[in-house]
């Protein structure tokens, strides 16, 4: 697999032109552009495993034709994932219990040189598999990998030490530690993620009052942004992400950030006094003066009720993975707010996907 590296700047310019055109109706200022490394930028990857007689190998599917194709190296992924791909398969081939009915391998790597390998099977994992997997982990560690092996099957998950890695991200000269849990969302392009965090910190400098973040994940943004606010209140619904966020808050010595496990809808009910929640015992919502809100919604964008919710805040920091739904939301948001800053983050080079950000101030 070869990447069109010589065309990188041209492709990025086309994305900029497209985003500029989309934001033009909203009187956006000049868009800041944050580029990506041209190869080995993706920190996670998933591959199906194709078995052919006595052989097996990684495959992917062509999005246009749906035809499978063999993948022996993957220059999009980190150098660590590539090295693991080439080291792992020969070791799996040595033990039938490790490769029989293996149908998928997921890799999660970090800038801090740690990696999780998840092996997915169409069979029950036995003590024999556990013994072989422990031996596999030892062999990989002898080859210099800081690795966690996880086995997954129907209603089964086996891990030997931990199901997470601790990433270290350099942001504005400071290192932030983020616990990343296997099978949970993490930003795929770590280098661009650092640039996103730096841009968000820059936008919110000199902020007054408190910050509210909806669906904070492992605290990726709220932990870095806490330095700019008196207090930060963040919501997240997934238990593993909440646990990771709590660890990250302590590890990064952030003392003004509170995570609550509830949905955006539940939070709105609590703020409006519609109903009480046991999860909020000990948290005085009235003590927060949140005049800034941060949102990073899924590709579908914000639903109409959440758009109305965020319009109540003087300042809105909106990170989007879909510029079309961002613009749909801006139709309403631009009635009350103006775009102060706009950015393009090239999280996904060589694709049409665009990550963007807007910093909105009440008119």
Swiss-Prot record:
It comes from the Bacteria. S-adenosyl-L-methionine binds at residues 187, 215, 220, 236, 296. GO terms for biological process: tRNA methylation. CDD domains: AdoMet_MTases. One of its GO terms (cellular component) is cytosol. The keyword Methyltransferase applies. Its EC number is 2.1.1.-, 2.1.1.35. GO terms for molecular function: rRNA binding; tRNA (uracil(54)-C5)-methyltransferase activity, S-adenosyl methionine-dependent; tRNA binding. It catalyses: uridine(54) in tRNA + S-adenosyl-L-methionine = 5-methyluridine(54) in tRNA + S-adenosyl-L-homocysteine + H(+); uridine(341) in tmRNA + S-adenosyl-L-methionine = 5-methyluridine(341) in tmRNA + S-adenosyl-L-homocysteine + H(+). Keywords: Methyltransferase, S-adenosyl-L-methionine, Transferase, tRNA processing. The active site is at residues 321, 355. Dual-specificity methyltransferase that catalyzes the formation of 5-methyluridine at position 54 (m5U54) in all tRNAs, and that of position 341 (m5U341) in tmRNA (transfer-mRNA). PANTHER family: TRNA/TMRNA (URACIL-C(5))-METHYLTRANSFERASE (PTHR47790), TRNA_TMRNA (URACIL-C(5))-METHYLTRANSFERASE (PTHR47790:SF2). Belongs to the class I-like SAM-binding methyltransferase superfamily. RNA M5U methyltransferase family. TrmA subfamily. This is tRNA/tmRNA (uracil-C(5))-methyltransferase. It comes from Haemophilus influenzae (strain PittEE). The lineage of its organism: Bacteria, Pseudomonadati, Pseudomonadota, Gammaproteobacteria, Pasteurellales. The gene is trmA.
């Amino acid at each position: 697999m070869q990447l069109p590296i010589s065309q990188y700047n041209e492709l990025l310019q086309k994305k900029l032109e497209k985003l500029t055109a989309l934001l033009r109706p909203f009187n956006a200022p000049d868009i800041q552009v944050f580029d990506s490394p041209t190869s080995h930028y993706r920190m996670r990857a998933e591959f199906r495993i194709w078995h052919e007689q006595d052989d097996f190998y990684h495959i992917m599917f062509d999005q246009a034709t749906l035809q499978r194709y063999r993948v022996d190296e993957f220059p999009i992924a980190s150098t660590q994932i590539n090295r693991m791909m080439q080291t792992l398969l020969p070791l799996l081939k040595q033990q039938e219990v490790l490769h029989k009915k293996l149908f998928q391998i997921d890799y999660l790597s970090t800038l801090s040189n740690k990696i999780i390998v998840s092996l997915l099977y169409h069979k029950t994992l036995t003590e024999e598999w556990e013994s072989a997997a422990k031996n596999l982990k030892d062999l990989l560690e002898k080859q210099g990998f800081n690795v966690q092996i996880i086995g997954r099957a129907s209603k089964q998950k086996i891990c030997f030490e931990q199901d997470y890695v601790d990433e270290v991200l350099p942001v504005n000269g400071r290192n932030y530690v983020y616990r990343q849990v296997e099978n949970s969302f993490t930003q795929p392009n770590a280098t661009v993620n650092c640039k996103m965090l730096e841009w968000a910190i820059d936008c919110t400098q000199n902020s007054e009052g408190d910050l509210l973040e909806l669906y904070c994940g492992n605290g990726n943004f709220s932990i870095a942004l806490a330095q700019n606010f008196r207090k930060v209140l963040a919501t997240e619904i997934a238990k593993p992400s909440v646990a990771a966020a709590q660890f990250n808050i302590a590890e990064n010595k952030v003392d003004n950030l509170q995570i609550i496990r509830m949905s955006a809808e539940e939070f709105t009910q609590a703020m409006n006094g519609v109903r009480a929640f046991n999860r909020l015992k000990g948290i005085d919502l009235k003590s927060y003066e949140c005049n800034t809100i941060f949102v990073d919604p899924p590709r579908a964008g914000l639903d109409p009720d959440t758009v109305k919710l965020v319009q109540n805040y003087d300042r809105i920091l909106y990170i989007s993975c879909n510029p079309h739904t961002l613009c749909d939301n801006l139709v309403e948001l631009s009635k009350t707010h103006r775009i102060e800053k706009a950015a393009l983050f090239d999280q996904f080079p060589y694709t049409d996907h665009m990550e963007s950000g807007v910093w909105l101030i009440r008119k």
